[in-house]
Amino acid sequence: MSGLKIYMDNDINLDLIKSKKIAVIGFGSQGYGQSLNLKDSGCDVILGLRQGGASDTKAKDYGLTTMSIPDAVKQADIIQILIPDEIQAQVYKEQIEPNLRAGQYLMFSHGFNIHYGFIKPPKDVNVIMVAPKAPGHTVRSEYKDGRGVPSLVAVYQDCSGESKELALSYAAAIGSGRTGIIETTFKEETETDLFGEQAVLCGGCSALIKTAFETLVEAGYSPYMAYFEVCHELKLIVDLIYQGGIEDMHYSISNNAEYGDLTRGEKLINKEVKAEMKKVLADIQSGKYAQEFMDEMASGGKRFSELRAASKGHLIEKIGSEIRSSFKWNRDNRLIDKSKN
């Protein structure tokens, strides 16, 4: 693609990140994946966590050094903030900002709090982003298999003159130089990431699956067959698209399936849906969505909890759980073990 620069391991100085002490704040999905990959790449990593908490125990079980967040910030050259978006600003204000010193690096894996101004860093620190384009469990599993996931890097403030090089070095240390690293901006990453999640990857996809499932069940079809046709098989199709684009997917499926795709797809995802997508994007660009999310979480997340409970209670979850527990393919090589990661 013209104008697209992809950085690989041979473009990057890995020794740069190895010369710094890295404090990873948080041990959720990304904290788990990134900190262990950094450790295995020979980096000097410490974890800033609530001492005695569940994450602290899990991190110690992996042989990682943990301490309080203020102590980790004081010791580190790089502070990678990997706690949930909704609590980053408060933790930053109370535990990180008072312990910052000039020349340190504040790092993020999502530009949300910087882009929307919930965190306002001092002018004498570097602010960078390394955003793996996969959940943390996949960041870890791909690294362990000798591969990596692509990452985006961005620079918001560069006091040192080497912020981009350091971001690239960090990305390589978590395995992304094996696959490819792309430069972007905090604005572009934040807005496209939120839109992708809401319109396709999470919101659009889950709503499409559930609506199609309901349509078949309400028409009298077995919920088990409905699950297989509109949910289980989705991965098989997405794998084809992931590897070779929509064209390769069309090449692999039957003429009947392709004709149905080309003649019926746009009847479902039509101009009205595109108009709604533009509204979703406008809310992201204006900051309206960001403020709504932060206000909801600050007020206790009552509506969020109700929506989450309704989703968990959908018939497709019961049917899916029953089907998955009956097949061996679901028990092998699971990425997520909630007791460990």
Language-model region placement:
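NAD(P)-dependent Rossmann-like dehydrogenase/reductase catalytic/cofactor-binding core
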Residues: 224-341
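Rossmann-fold dinucleotide-binding core
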Residues: 107-198
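NAD(P)+-binding Rossmann beta1-loop-alpha1 motif at the extreme N-terminus of oxidoreductases
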Residues: 2-66
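Short, flexible, solvent-exposed loop/turn segments with mixed acidic/basic and small polar residues
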Residues: 37, 68-71, 139-146
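A short helix->loop->beta-strand "cap" motif at the edges of active sites that frequently abuts
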Residues: 43, 100-104, 123-125
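Active-site-proximal catalytic alpha-helix in oxidoreductases
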Residues: 161-165, 174-175, 180-219, 224-242
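Rossmann-fold NAD(P) dinucleotide-binding segment
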Residues: 69-119
